[in-house]
Amino acid sequence: LPCFPFAKQLGCSPNEVAQKIVDSLELDIGEAVAVGPYVNIRASLTWLANQINQKPEPKGSILIEHTSANPNGPFHVGRARNAVLGDTFVRMHRAAGYDVTAEYYVDDMGKQVGILCWALENLDEGRVHSLLDEGGITSEPSPHSEKHDHARVLWYQAANLLKAQDASVDAGVTELVQLSEEADEDVLNRFESAYQPVLDGMLETLGRMGIHFDSFTKESRFIVDGSVETMMEKLESSELHGVAENGAHFLELESKGVKGKSTQFFYRRGDGSSLYATRDLAYHQYKWTQSGRLMNILGEDHKLQSKQVGIALEELNIQPPEVVFYAFTKLDDGKMSTRRG
């Protein structure tokens, strides 16, 4: 404790203030010592042991969603950072007496899974290695080559390279994704067959770090059960609602403090289908049925979307979650990328 602010008010030196404070203190936690103009308080080992062994009072439930990385390849250090931070919050809240649910939101119907599925169904191993060699991405065996997340990411990377050369690849992936957004059971099953071994490999990696999840929720759940469609219909009654020339629906958020070029939050495409963020609305509505408090751990690149989703949730009379953002580190040779290996 620095005593400089008190010295002028009391009309004596900071050193004298520090000593007077120490002389007047009666501490249960240990001892106080005056060190020049500072007061140092030292907790005794007995007090610390009692605090650690003391069972905290129950504080209610909290669902902490973290990691939720696309199941298209192994963790790189950037994606794993979310898991470490998220698990830290899980452990801290458990230690503080909360009933914590560690949640993983599985992106089981997006473009990344669509690319992986298309690649596994259309590319053989020889074609994959040929494409990777041409693209300068190593496909040499590694100590982890047998793990499905390390093995299948090669197909994902190869398909991305081929997509840049062959428009039919993008068309094929787009068709799969569109069918998944229509809750096509066959396509969703094919997607799961493609990504589940990858997700299992990713979870094995996290398990070695002592990171585990209590629940997994698939994004497609909210398409299949109709809750996304219900959300979109409700948003049409919002005063913020608008329709673009191509028939897409959006909320105009400028009046809510969103600035810049992205003041419109699009939630329905012109063809009537939903977007990822729309499904996020239904997901948060569901999460509130599972817990009395919600927390999301996100990278700072999600700040705008998180704010947009929060405003949309308020328009639906749903409380937004607490969000913890973490910053990124710039690397000399560019961003970490699963697609580029």
Language-model-detected regions and their locations in the chain:
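NTP-dependent nucleotidyl-transfer catalytic core
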Residues: L1-G341
